[in-house]
Swiss-Prot record:
GO function terms (MF aspect): ATP binding; GMP synthase activity
Reaction equations catalysed: XMP + L-glutamine + ATP + H2O = GMP + L-glutamate + AMP + diphosphate + 2 H(+)
The gene coding this protein: guaA
UniProt-annotated binding residues for ATP: 234-240
EC number(s) on file: 6.3.5.2
PANTHER family: GMP SYNTHASE [GLUTAMINE-HYDROLYZING], GMP SYNTHASE-RELATED
Protein keywords: ATP-binding, Glutamine amidotransferase, GMP biosynthesis, Ligase, Nucleotide-binding, Purine biosynthesis
NCBIfam families: guaA_Cterm, guaA_Nterm, PRK00074.1
Name this polypeptide is given: GMP synthase [glutamine-hydrolyzing]
Metabolic or biological pathway, per its Swiss-Prot or TrEMBL entry: Purine metabolism; GMP biosynthesis; GMP from XMP (L-Gln route): step 1/1
Keyword Nucleotide-binding: yes
Length: 536
């Protein structure tokens, strides 16, 4: 059994990034809600495998009576504790310090000065000042701040606007940082978390994906037993890896249902069948439901409404297919499997403690009501995208499948702004295919990689507005598409990709000349945050 780090989640949108960074250090960790009891904490630590505790951030204020605090037992276990942002504030508040509302909110990049040569920050820095002070470039997101240290703590870090940006009680191995080491904007954040879990906690670096496969296979077999499972197969990375993992566990007990809702990428239906039936030898039922989906989406322009309609129609299709399978007396279909991953859960406010603020609903999480009559199997629910890809490779899936850019469950339905129409989808399919084709074709000289491999996600978006153009001697009045390409390591934050002008020029020229009905191409230069990766 692995040694473990316990992460208590107070509802931050980026809590799961803490888990991701720790797993990158090959240390096993689990996320649990912050409102667990003292008895639960003591029982969790009873096997001697608990090596440390991390308290996450939150949008709440610790001095309000109704907000959650850490279970007091956390500070009595004798293991190291790290508080991040709100986690530091609740540590200070509960141990006798003072937390107050700041006069100004600190959100964004900041330069933090390290103090006191603590075990957590010793030797970790981005640069030194002329006076020789070690400085860290970090990401802040807070309004409240610690104004008085608890007894036994010393100052560990500060900024100009936050005099106590870090604190340490090295005797008890309690540490707090006001900034977020888990996000990529904190350049040395991974090193800080590695220092905590490996050096201060002394946890073994023995968490590898091969271990996850064996444990997940065992868990799936125990969950499912002799029941049969159906899985909604989209051809994307998540559902593909989920299918391969479940197939590894239960083989012929898995039936994949591939729904062609009329909102897939160009030729995707045929490619999915070739890949899964021809190469993986899985059982796949293909359902042509384009008319059903497009009919229900007619006249609907609200993004949330579209997502919910698509989710609802998936339920109807699955109910119909499940009924067919259940009618066979020799089979017992009891489970619906999904390729839900951590970012889906987080952005839907569906983290384990249900305290995260909802940004937008996700197709995988919110589209399946209990009336489906099937239990939910989500073997990738605790994994981030990079871990899912690593798992896919370990399962023997082809590289091009595993490293294909993610595609949303609602498909082009959330890449067509406003009302979804078949003509719009046909135009967008062709424009998107050209964009992806040229990303594969253009090679970056410095790295030797294609721009498809250098971007994390790229796609075209259909804008239901027309602009005036000129083709030959004639005037055109046609639609506009926007190109979107981002670079990210975790999909929680993302930067827009600085594609070469020559590439953008080629893509624009091809789309305008080859896709009749489009006469203008734009490029989206928004990062996440404040924008999301998808437009809807």
């Amino acid at each position: 059994m692995h040694q473990k780090i316990l992460i208590l989640d107070f509802g931050s949108q980026v809590t799961q990034l803490i888990a991701r960074r720790i797993r990158e250090a090959h240390v096993f960790c689990e996320v649990h809600p912050c409102d667990v009891t003292d008895d639960w904490v003591r029982a969790y630590a009873r096997d001697g495998k608990l090596k440390g505790v991390i308290l996450s951030g939150s949008h709440a204020s610790v001095y309000e009576e109704t907000t959650d605090k850490a279970p007091p037992a956390v500070f009595e276990l004798g293991v190291p504790v790290l508080g991040i942002c709100y986690g530091m504030q609740t540590m200070a508040h509960q141990l006798g310090g003072i937390v107050t509302s700041g006069h100004q909110r600190e959100f964004g990049p900041a330069d933090v000065r390290a103090h006191g040569h603590t075990a957590l920050l010793e030797g970790i820095q981005d640069y030194k000042t002329a006076a020789g002070h070690g400085m860290l470039q970090v990401w802040m997101s807070h309004g409240d701040k610690v104004t008085e240290l608890p007894h036994g703590f010393k100052l560990m870090a500060s900024t100009d606007s936050c005099p106590i940006a870090g604190m340490a009680d090295e005797t008890r191995r309690f540490y707090g940082v006001q900034f977020h080491p888990e996000v990529t904007h904190t350049k040395r954040g991974a090193a800080i978390l590695e220092r905590f879990v490996l050096d201060i906690c002394g946890a073994r670096a023995d968490w590898i994906m091969g271990d996850y496969i064996s444990e997940a296979v065992e868990q799936i077999r125990a969950q499912v037993g002799t029941d049969e499972v159906i899985l909604g197969l989209s051809g994307g990375v998540d559902s593909s890896v989920a299918a391969a993992l479940i197939h590894r566990a239960i083989g012929e007990q898995l039936t994949c249902v591939f729904v062609d809702h009329g909102l897939l990428r160009l030729n995707e239906g045929d490619l999915v069948m070739e890949m899964f039936v021809g190469k993986l030898h899985a059982k796949v039922i293909r359902v042509d439901a384009a008319d059903q989906f497009l009919g229900q989406l007619a006249g609907v322009s609200d993004p949330e409404a579209k997502r919910k309609i698509i989710g609802r129609e998936f339920v109807e299709v699955f109910k119909a297919e499940a009924a067919k399978l259940k009618s066979d007396q020799s089979r017992h279909v009891a489970w619906l499997a999904q390729g839900t991953i951590y970012p889906d859960v987080i952005e839907s406010g569906g983290a384990k403690n249900k305290k995260a603020v909802v940004i937008k609903s996700h197709h995988n999480v919110g589209g399946l009501p209990e009336l489906l009559g099937l239990k939910l199997l989500e073997p990738l629910r605790e994994l981030f995208k990079d871990e899912v890809r690593e798992l896919g490779v370990a399962l023997g899936l082809p590289y091009h499948m595993v490293y294909r850019h993610p595609f949303p469950g609602p498909g082009l339905g959330v890449r067509i702004l406003g009302e979804v129409k078949k003509d719009y989808a046909d135009l967008l399919r062709r424009a998107d295919a050209i964009f992806i084709d040229e990303l594969h074709n253009f090679i970056d000289e410095a790295s030797g990689k294609s721009w498809y491999d250098l971007t994390s996600q790229a796609f075209a978006v259909f804008l239901p507005v027309k602009s005036v153009g000129v083709m030959g001697d004639g005037r055109t009045y046609d639609y506009v598409v926007a190109l979107r390409a981002v670079q990210t390591s975790d999909f929680m934050t993302a930067d827009w990709a600085e594609l070469p002008y020559a590439l953008l020029k080629k893509v624009s020229s091809r789309i305008i000349n080859e896709v009749r009905g489009i006469n203008r191409v734009t490029y989206d230069v928004s990062s996440k945050p404040p924008a999301t990766i998808e437009w809807e």
